[in-house]
Amino acid sequence: MSKLRKGDTVIVIAGKDKGKQGTVQAVKNDRIKVEGINIVTKHQKPNQATGVEGGILKQEAFLHISNVAILNAQTQKADRITYQFGEDGKKQRLYRSNGEVVATA
């Protein structure tokens, strides 16, 4: 289970895009797709049946979830997430450094 969710703002902590920030677009198992990060070039063949034009496309690719960390909105630094049950009995995600509740998108 991933502690990051779609809509979270993350910072890349390792790899060619280290230091860049973006919003999570998708989470699959232990991989994550971040807006504007890990751009790769894809060669698309044209397909008349589906109406897809061919060409060279640039798109985001998945990267391993260990290479990103959630961005703490108050400190603007990478942080980790912990869980705690609130007074209403629901599980909440908290920043580990200051204990503030993570804003969900």
From Swiss-Prot:
Keywords from the UniProt entry: Ribonucleoprotein, Ribosomal protein, RNA-binding, rRNA-binding
InterPro entries assigned: KOW, Rib_uL2_dom2, Ribosomal_uL24, Ribosomal_uL24_CS, Ribosomal_uL24_KOW, Translation_prot_SH3-like_sf
GO cellular component: ribonucleoprotein complex; ribosome
One Pfam family matching this protein: KOW
GO BP annotation list: translation
Listed SUPFAM superfamilies: Translation proteins SH3-like domain
Superkingdom as given in the UniProt entry: Bacteria
One of the record's GO molecular function terms: rRNA binding
Family, similarity comment: Belongs to the universal ribosomal protein uL24 family.
HAMAP family with a match to the protein in the record: Ribosomal_uL24_B (MF_01326_B)
Function, as annotated: One of two assembly initiator proteins, it binds directly to the 5'-end of the 23S rRNA, where it nucleates assembly of the 50S subunit. One of the proteins that surrounds the polypeptide exit tunnel on the outside of the subunit.
Oligomeric form and interacting partners: Part of the 50S ribosomal subunit.
Protein's recorded name: Large ribosomal subunit protein uL24
